[in-house]
């Protein structure tokens, strides 16, 4: 009570449960005997679930029982046997396929999973695979499409009955030998069962590596299309754009455009910068109007010295500037021009970090000096009797401040601020104002000194006059004789 199935991948032996499922086993044995299963496709392979075959049409909707062969279309199907109940517990269980009305025809399935309880009571178990489980495993691992149809044909080439306990029904036509397959049977529209799937046969190692690289690139492109990074997996980068790397951080867009413009008109030249700091990332993209100009620049400019750096030039592999509408959409030349116009428009909003700071915010040192000047002038008015050393200290303070100012000038020059000349004139103006204030202070002090000297000299002169008058009065009050004696003594 066993049958040998010769498949395109190997032989499989099935033992039948003739006592538990006599009608199903009779149907299966007699169909094998009339070579009904020869060249049938395995048309449904669901990994770790089932392998389905037995339909001569290969669609899964055909096939009839042996009783239909004997008694006509009215007997194409027979009732399912449900008693005793046999479960789909192990791999290799063989069952007749239910056509939806608890009836069976010619199709059967082989399980490739364990404990498939949801098949119990639906499909009738009538045998199991005892030999050839390795072949069942190969079939289980074959590649299939979305409908679970194998890409390469797997067929039952021949069936051999090893033991048949049932008598042949009358009028059963048994062929003398296996019939030849028809063209319709072999033409499935897929890879033939006898075809070798070897793309690398007869190719050199270099060609094999190239084919593998192309397949890997194609796979990655499809993956990028799936995640939305590419409009189409078959899209190609533009052939008029150059990629330039190993640039000096000080190299600007204008510098590169001037250097590369000698090869032809340039549409755009962009040095890629960090979005947050604005610093150059040392690579750029240059788009030419003509592909010929791009090729000339590629051959001439590689390894050229620019700003003390040896640059590297290659054709761009980026499609970042390509605009598409929706996933997998195509783009036109007009769409590309519209995209360029949108990129050239100035943004309506400016990031706070990119706004130029006001002029006052860059001169904290000058503002501090002005505050010190106002403070010193206020103290000068309140204390006019300060010594001359105060003026000298102010001059020394100015001399000490000059290096700071020069340092700031160097810093602003390095930062590249264009309005440095205005800031320098502002500095000179403030310096002249301070010099005027210092001169005014010195003049006021000199006037105070002159006034003090004149007042002291005047008071001394008045004191001398007063003493003279007083001495005259004393002389008058004395006797004439004494005065005469005194005068005589003078002339002695």
Curated annotation (Swiss-Prot):
There is a cross-link at residues 201, 212, 218, 321, 362, 405, 460 (Glycyl lysine isopeptide (Lys-Gly) (interchain with G-Cter in SUMO2)). InterPro entries: CRIP, Cyclophilin-like_dom_sf, Cyclophilin-type_PPIase_dom, Cyclophilin_PPIL4, Nucleotide-bd_a/b_plait_sf, RBD_domain_sf, RRM_dom. Residues 240-318 form the RRM domain. Residues 377-390 have a biased composition (Basic residues). It catalyses: [protein]-peptidylproline (omega=180) = [protein]-peptidylproline (omega=0). GO terms for cellular component: cytosol; nucleoplasm; nucleus. Residues 1-161 form the PPIase cyclophilin-type domain. Keywords: Isomerase, Isopeptide bond, Nucleus, Phosphoprotein, RNA-binding, Rotamase, Ubl conjugation. Residues 177-187, 426-452, 482-492 have a biased composition (Basic and acidic residues). The modification Phosphothreonine is found at residue 182. The keyword Zinc does not apply. It is an enzyme of class 5 (isomerase). CDD domains: cyclophilin_RRM, RRM_PPIL4. The modification Phosphoserine is found at residues 178, 393, 471. It is found in: Nucleus. Abundantly expressed in kidney but has a ubiquitously low expression pattern in other adult tissues. Residues 167-188, 368-406, 423-492 are annotated as: Disordered. It comes from the Eukaryota. Its EC number is 5.2.1.8. The keyword Isomerase applies. One of its GO terms (molecular function) is RNA binding. PPIases accelerate the folding of proteins. It catalyzes the cis-trans isomerization of proline imidic peptide bonds in oligopeptides. Belongs to the cyclophilin-type PPIase family. PPIL4 subfamily. This is Peptidyl-prolyl cis-trans isomerase-like 4. The gene is PPIL4.
């Amino acid at each position: 009570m066993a049958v040998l199935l010769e498949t395109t991948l190997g032989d499989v032996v099935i033992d039948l449960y003739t006592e538990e499922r006599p009608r199903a086993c009779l149907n299966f044995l007699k169909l094998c005997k009339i070579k009904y299963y020869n060249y049938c496709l395995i048309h449904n392979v669901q990994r770790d679930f089932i392998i389905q075959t037995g339909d001569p049409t290969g669609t899964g909707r055909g096939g009839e029982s042996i009783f239909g062969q004997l008694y006509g279309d009215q007997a194409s199907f027979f009732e399912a046997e449900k008693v005793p109940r046999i479960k789909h517990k192990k791999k290799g269980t063989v069952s007749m396929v239910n056509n939806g009305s608890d009836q069976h025809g010619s199709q059967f399935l082989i399980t490739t999973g364990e404990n498939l309880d949801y098949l119990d009571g639906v499909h009738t178990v009538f045998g199991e695979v005892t030999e050839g489980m390795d072949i069942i495993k190969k079939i289980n691992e074959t590649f299939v499409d979305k409908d679970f149809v194998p890409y390469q044909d797997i067929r039952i080439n021949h069936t051999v009955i090893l033991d048949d306990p049932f008598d042949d029904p009358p009028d059963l036509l048994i062929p003398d030998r296996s019939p030849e397959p028809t063209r319709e049977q072999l033409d499935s529209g897929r890879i033939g069962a006898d075809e070798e799937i070897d793309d690398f046969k007869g190719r050199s190692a270099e060609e094999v590596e190239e084919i593998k690289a192309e397949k890997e690139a194609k796979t990655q492109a499809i993956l990028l299309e799936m995640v939305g990074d590419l409009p189409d997996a078959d899209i190609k980068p533009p052939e008029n754009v150059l990629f330039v790397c190993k640039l000096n951080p000080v190299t600007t867009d204008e510098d590169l455009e001037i250097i590369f413009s000698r090869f032809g008109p340039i549409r755009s030249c962009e040095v890629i910068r960090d979005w947050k700091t604005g610093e150059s990332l040392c690579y750029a993209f240059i788009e030419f109007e003509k592909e010929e100009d791009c090729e000339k620049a590629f051959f001439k400019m590689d390894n050229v010295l620019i700003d003390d750096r040896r640059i590297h030039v290659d054709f761009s592999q980026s499609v970042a500037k390509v605009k598409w509408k929706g996933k997998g959409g195509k783009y036109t030349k007009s769409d590309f021009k519209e995209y360029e116009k949108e990129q050239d428009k100035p943004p309506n909003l400016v990031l706070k970090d990119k706004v130029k700071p006001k002029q006052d915010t860059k001169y904290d040192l000058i503002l501090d000096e002005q505050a010190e000047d106002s403070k010193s002038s206020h103290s000068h008015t309140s204390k006019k009797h300060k010594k001359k050393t105060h003026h000298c200290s102010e001059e020394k303070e100015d001399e000490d401040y000059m290096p700071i100012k020069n340092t700031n000038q160097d810093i602003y020059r390095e930062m590249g601020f264009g309005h440095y000349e205005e800031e320098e004139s502002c500095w000179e103006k403030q310096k002249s104002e301070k010099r005027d204030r210092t001169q005014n202070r010195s003049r006021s002090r000199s006037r105070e000194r002159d006034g003090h000297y004149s007042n002291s000299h005047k008071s001394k002169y008045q004191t001398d006059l007063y003493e003279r008058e007083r001495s005259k009065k004393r002389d008058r009050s004395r006797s004439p004789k004494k005065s005469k004696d005194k005068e005589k003594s003078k002339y002695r």
